[in-house]
Amino acid sequence: MYCLRFALPLQAKRQDMDKQQNRNQAHLPYRIIALDLDGTLTNHDKVITPKTREVLLKAQQEGAIVVLASGRPTYGIVPLANELKLDTHGGFILAYNGGKIVDWGTQQECFAQHLPPSAIPVIYEYAKRKGHALLGYAGNEIVTEMPDDPYVKEESRINKMNIRRVDNLLMHLEPNPTKLLMTGEPTTMIVAEEELAEQLGDKMDVFRSAPFFLELVPKGIDKAQSLLRLLAKVNLTPADMIAFGDGYNDLSMLRLAGMGVAMANAAPEVRADADYVTLSNEEDGVAAALEKFLNI
């Protein structure tokens, strides 16, 4: 579903936001701010520090559009979107590493790409056979047959989403899911990545986002491709964007952006590829770079 299909009141709301942003942002060297969350926007406690929050609110007041771009599910991003008042200022949520875009000003889905239906039972049977936990998302809940798995609990903690135990995961997933997550000990996830990539790699992407997390997502989705869709919607170009990240899944958007900023705590390859390296996520690195490059 695309944003052009909004009901008229929502179209009017978005148009009003766009006009206000256009009036305010003329002096900004970068008019869209794309932010990874974990290890970038948030500190080790998974919270936004007061300094970083203050600078991002000020940037939005001056017309900047904030995009929260994460591998998290939509409802795992919502608390941070609300904290930064993206609903008031017309920001966007980019969830599942780009698999879904939500206009948080109107709370309407702009874009979604789904897992191929034929792959889902294959993944499910593989997890059952190997004894790995497999989870999906239903509204604001994590659904799984293994709620006591420590890595399932970690996904719950990161996203601040409750876990619901189900007897058959396939019966409780959202229609047309965008992502499944398999969890297990790091050595077993290496094997699972290799085996599932060989079996399903022509249909979908399989990769580890952490040693114990195996992501199963639509093929060809990344943050840069979804940001290009979003930039076209708001009539901006990559040159208008400053992007922040720390992980390998952030590289595509750092390369796309007019200014790609890596955190000091980023992986060495990410720092080497960035246009600029700021302070760490424990030192208000996002705020420091925005003050430098946006003159706010």
Could you tell me what each predicted segment is?
Residues 52, 77-81, 192, 196, ...:
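Hydrophobic packing residues within well-ordered alpha-helices of enzyme cores
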Residues 39, 59, 70, 97, ...:
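Residue-level signal for inorganic ion chemistry
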Residues 23-32, 49, 215-296:
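Mg2+-dependent phosphoryl-transfer enzymes with acidic/Ser/Thr/Gly-rich catalytic loops
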Residues 84, 89, 97, 200-202, ...:
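Short, structured coil segments at secondary-structure junctions
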Residues 126-244, 248:
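Conserved acidic, metal-coordinating active-site core of Asp-based
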Residues 63-67, 89-91, 179, 239-241, ...:
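Short active-site oxyanion
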Residues 1-37, 54-57, 61:
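Non-catalytic pre-domain segments flanking phosphatase-related domains
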Residues 50-151:
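Active-site phosphate-binding/coordination module
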